């Protein structure tokens, strides 16, 4: 889903070739059916890069990642206030749900809990 540069897509700034580390996030975006476009950068600050990516995306959502952190930003938020921040050491379900939530921001539907499993069933605790 990341090959067509003319279709509206979530812009993802990949800093220092780290996209392989965040595969679950990309799969979460794909699960929701929203296209994304990878933009490789040799260096940069993650929060600012995510905000710049959101500004460049017609979908108003941008993501940036380095080897330690991934940030989801929305164009209408202040540059210093990203919507979601994910650390690499968090579990794969949090990674997948962050991708789902970036796509859900585009769709305008409720977010998933970052730590819940996406089974489609509600659990009472």
From Swiss-Prot:
Catalysed transformations (reactions): ATP + H2O = ADP + phosphate + H(+)
Quaternary data: Component of the DDR complex, a heterotetramer of DdrA(2)/DdrB(2). The DDR complex interacts with the diol dehydratase complex in the presence of ADP but not ATP.
InterPro entries given in the database record: B12-dep_deHydtase_bsu (IPR010254), Dehydtase/Dehydtase_re (IPR003208), Diol/glycerol_deHydtase_re_ssu (IPR009192)
GO molecular function, one term: metal ion binding
Function: Small subunit of the diol dehydratase-reactivating factor (DDR), which reactivates suicidally inhibited adenosylcobalamin-dependent diol dehydratase (DD, pddA, pddB, pddC). DDR acts as a chaperone, reactivates inactivated DD holoenzyme in the presence of ATP, Mg(2+) and free adenosylcobalamin (AdoCbl), by mediating the exchange of the tightly bound damaged cofactor AdoCbl for a free intact one. Reactivation takes place in two steps: ADP-dependent cobalamin release, and ATP-dependent dissociation of the DD apoenzyme-DDR complex.
Listed Pfam families: Dehydratase_MU (PF02288)
Organism: Klebsiella michiganensis (strain ATCC 8724 / DSM 4798 / JCM 20051 / NBRC 3318 / NRRL B-199 / KCTC 1686 / BUCSAV 143 / CCM 1901)
Protein name per UniProt: Diol dehydratase-reactivating factor small subunit
């Amino acid at each position: 889903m990341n090959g067509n540069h003319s279709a509206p897509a979530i812009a993802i700034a990949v800093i220092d070739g780290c996209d392989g580390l965040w595969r679950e996030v990309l799969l979460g975006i794909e699960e929701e059916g929203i296209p994304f476009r990878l933009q490789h950068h040799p260096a940069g600050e993650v929060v600012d890069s995510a905000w710049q990516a959101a500004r460049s995306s017609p979908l108003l959502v941008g993501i940036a990642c380095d080897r330690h952190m991934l940030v989801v930003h929305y164009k209408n938020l202040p540059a210093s206030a990203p919507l979601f921040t994910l650390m690499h050491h968090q579990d794969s379900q949090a990674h997948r749900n962050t991708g789902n939530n970036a796509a859900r921001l585009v769709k305008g539907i409720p977010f998933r809990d970052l730590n819940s499993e996406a089974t489609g069933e509600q659990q009472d605790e």
